[in-house]
């Protein structure tokens, strides 16, 4: 509890929201928190995000008038990110090397995201190749607490118009 507010943790979902009408498009959903609204229609996602932004603005502006121009959806619902940073780690303590996104609610556990729907297919192919390369060579990820290992992140950037790809292993 901090300054008049409390924080909690979700233990279990007993019933899906009526807004969750779609099947997940990702194999690691809902463990990964990268695209937690994917079971909602894109239209409902935009409505929900509009409410969230308006609540933040109303609170920050303390009743000051402003002109709301609305939320404008992207023409591309999936594979829209042109930059992504994936983490090296393990899915569980002392497990095999993984490369992907952090497990929802965890700063340590990493889930391999080889079918991530946020990035272009080229980037998921590179992620898979880099993961396999270091897995075969038994290269370990950097463990912050022990100050051992090497691999920290894989940064990928793709030029939308050129298709050029930057691969940066950290």
Residue ranges and their predicted role:
Residues 1-170:
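Accessory RNA-recognition modules of RNA-modification enzymes
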